[in-house]
């Protein structure tokens, strides 16, 4: 590959330019999907290295210029920046390509010092009190001025760099699919005015193969292009390329400071002087205070100082400027909130923080303070600590990689960890040296990149557009491709939600716990979008209730795709401006759409379940439309399909109530629109077809209510109409909005520290609260009662879905090593925890049995509870009563099971899983002996349970069995257990050893097993029964090694 390097101490482009024809995609903007959460690796990372310096520093220099100190992205310019002690490297982010660099000379290093760190001048899309107004923040979203970043040196100089690139946010989004815009806040006129001619031949860079000038290597794909204008235009593969655009890097000015620069923030503002102009605001933290500098045309125009002592970090959080300092004597961290206009400081202490803080972050309006062994989340609104947690390792690096996920690097600089904001682990890399020794045992290997990955020491990382870049002190960097969750925000209370992941390779992963669906419930189904381009931004992926229809919106290309999962047919609708979409039941799609004039409306589309007609336009499917009032900002749209349909009492013209079920009108769902002024609830009125499908007849505006002051409408993630009120999930809290006696409305916070709603199915809601998986009934949640169950979340097993019918939680786990990465679904039954919680609350045993006995894992749950209580030497009274109730006749379902079938199965499985020294605790409370168990199996012809018990007895040595079945004082330590021990020693019939020597009983057992095997119609059951017979013959032989009895002969005689 031919790359022209820079030889002077000035930034230059590293690529040769070549003209290229592009077609600019037109169309209006759309709201980007903000409901992104989980991240998982697609594969192990690709390991790369930065190039060496072009000009040598000179002999005797001890600077290690391979040390990558920091990495940073400028998303609005599709740029990645890497900083070394003497260089600034500018990469085109997508596709990855080095396009410019600045190499500092020895004279520059001696005068200004080595590079230490860097900060970008960031356009904030929110208010900063005293700096950026609401109007300015919206304007700066689109007109962001110059691309500026600052490099701090170890001699307290600021090197101010500018990147000149002919691009806008709109173009970066459309051409590369990088989500850098929020178009809903901008008018169509502003969006179009920001566009320019992207076909500029002088902007496109092309890399040629140095051995063949006709072979172009540009974005990782080698394409041979013959000369000739017509062929160049007609080459179809050319359309799939992503262009690498020219940029220019300039060092504009060097700022000198007399004090140590501890930290700084760069902010863009828009001056109101004259016609207005862009200004750079530098907020620099010194040991003596915080200095605010206003820079216009790279000259300081204004300066002010706020006195803050011993500051270590500065940050903008929840529209406020803050400085953090640490008091090692008092062992506390001070959060100083700065009032810029009044030049005042409000100090709030965070106690019990003995360590120096590493860094601080802003996550969803909360201040996250990171220490080496602890992370604290501070609520800046109420000025109190929300929660804190400790990872099981010492932290070296921590930063957020999206609004929900923190990436932590351990002190060994090797392993990375994806944590949720409440400290639940999603994924971690733990490299085992054995993974590398087999492939790297060649000492003569020339390429050190093939050495063990454990040698890679991370110094920094950045994440953008489902790609994670980690850099190291050795000059190497890793490129990770990630799966990203697309949250399913619609709820069908009759069916569980799907879990959906996407990547940048046009792949979509779907998991559904529904066993009867076309999606395999044990595997993750991968769907490939019908495109070869790699610049698609997938804003939404939604699956309907029956798991037959799949809707995807590619927002940077204005394309809505609908896929039939059964027929594998795609329908494509171009030039659509979709801001949000939700499935309503099986075949209705509710869309929030933007029109050409900038107005928005809601549309309900009736999508055919069978193969769609390719000639039909999307507008032909519209069956309902609601125009959003002008100047109204829509924050979110919510669709809930109800579990219990509400019958509407409608009277005909002759005042006779209609009693025909097919014509009965039902409220089957609700659509809730949350705006900046009010919440609007639409009832969906339907009839139910005999096949089970809902047929929508009308949309009725049921309720309009003003948003309460203490609920931020832009934070609402879910809402439901309940008991003539509303239940919100907003800002990590469940908030109840109900009517009061005076006719007004009152809010009540029901739960806090809510991380995620897993699902809402029938009358139950499943959430992650802190470190726990919590199940509530909606009624209990509304009435502020206790949850049904709360279960700690295991590390690396985060719940993604649930199946109430089996009381099972489905979790996602990543199998990862140096060679491959694979996502697998694991299943955890929580029914035992649910029953145990009921027992602890002294719930009536009959109610527990009635509510849960028909769940599939019920017997397993009882067995698990019994085993746990035995091992803890707890009372077995309640659980044994519950086990015996399982075999009672059920009058409701007219079922009469065998008298002790369930109990025998539970007891035998429990004995199989606990040590023999605990058996007597069970037998004593059960008031049965081992002989009684075997006799009961024979009496009720329970061959399977009989076989299980025999196999349990066979697994123990005769001497050990006898020793274990005698209680020892040290084991139990009570007078009761001592008495039981003496009693069990005296009575030989309680000894399993003597029991197995009972000839007549063994013959009865063998007869039952042989009869069961001979009469079995199921081949598997027959095989199991014969296996048990052979095991019993082996037992009889072992018990009569000296051939003193006639056991075997009697057994044979019985079957002649």
Curated annotation (Swiss-Prot):
A GO CC annotation given for this chain: Ric1-Rgp1 guanyl-nucleotide exchange factor complex
Pfam families: RIC1
InterPro entries: Ric1, RIC1_C
Keyword Membrane among record annotations: yes
Superkingdom in the source lineage: Eukaryota
Keywords: Golgi apparatus, Guanine-nucleotide releasing factor, Membrane, Transcription, Transcription regulation
Transmembrane segments: none
Further remark: Present with 78 molecules/cell in log phase SD medium.
Family: Belongs to the RIC1 family. Highly divergent.
Assembly with partners or alone: Forms a complex with RGP1.
Listed name of the protein: Guanine nucleotide exchange factor subunit RIC1
Organism: Saccharomyces cerevisiae (strain ATCC 204508 / S288c)
Name of encoding gene: RIC1
